[in-house]
Amino acid sequence: MTDLPEKEGGRFHASVLTLYPEMFPGPLGISLAGKALAEGKWQLDTVQIRDFAEGRHRMVDDTPSGGGAGMVMKADVVARALDSVDDGRPMLLMTPRGKPLTQERVRALADGAGAIILCGRFEGVDERVIEGRNLEEISIGDYILSGGETAAIVLLDAVVRLLPGVMGNRESGETESFETGLLEHPHYTRPQEWEGRAIPDILTSGNHGAIDKWRLEQAERITRERRPDLWEAYCKNRRKIGGQ
């Protein structure tokens, strides 16, 4: 097993394999991610999968063995594309059948040298290349998109904002939803009153201990009501820490 590569100049390097390279950087070229990209805090390149197809028609897909609807991305073509950029970075396949993307996985990727991201299309990718290249299958939710490009953008946006120097306030990232195991507490800003609704008095009291307590209580309430799965995991972790 080879050692994972170190970050080149400290930069996270993303290589996206796609049939639609024109979709990148897309939203990753603006706001936090775009500024960080322009400043060289991370690197993005795309690989056109069709460049690795052979024959006059440069076919990247074929009919599914055993019959069925749609087309399947060819193992040989995809493998050549992957091999062209393989340097030990994790290889990810964006697919609805993958493991759900979590903030924990996002943090792990942000701490690494980068990722090679394969964007699926059609009915999917030949299983043999998934096994042969040890692709990690990742899903961003229980719904179907036209392709993996949008999912790759979501993943990269989540990763890039955690890279050093990208977010101005480190605390902002550490207190967001999922970072603490809870959904985030409510936020307010001026004016003090809007359409008869006032900012909770506790937030303007200047008592930071009381404010922290209120925010935790609100985060716990929202998580308990909206994400019982997260609430159960949070409670389990608290019991573990408490030695109960």
Curated annotation (Swiss-Prot):
Domain of life, per lineage: Bacteria
Cysteines engaged in disulfide bonds, as pairs: none
Pfam family of the protein (one): tRNA_m1G_MT
Sorted UniProt keywords: Cytoplasm, Methyltransferase, S-adenosyl-L-methionine, Transferase, tRNA processing
CC terms in the record's Gene Ontology section: cytosol
InterPro entries: Alpha/beta_knot_MTases (IPR029028), tRNA_m1G_MeTrfase_C_sf (IPR023148), tRNA_m1G_MeTrfase_TrmD (IPR002649), tRNA_m1G_MTases_N (IPR029026), tRNA_MeTrfase_TRMD/TRM10 (IPR016009)
Protein name: tRNA (guanine-N(1)-)-methyltransferase
Lineage, uppermost ranks: Bacteria, Pseudomonadati, Pseudomonadota, Alphaproteobacteria, Hyphomicrobiales
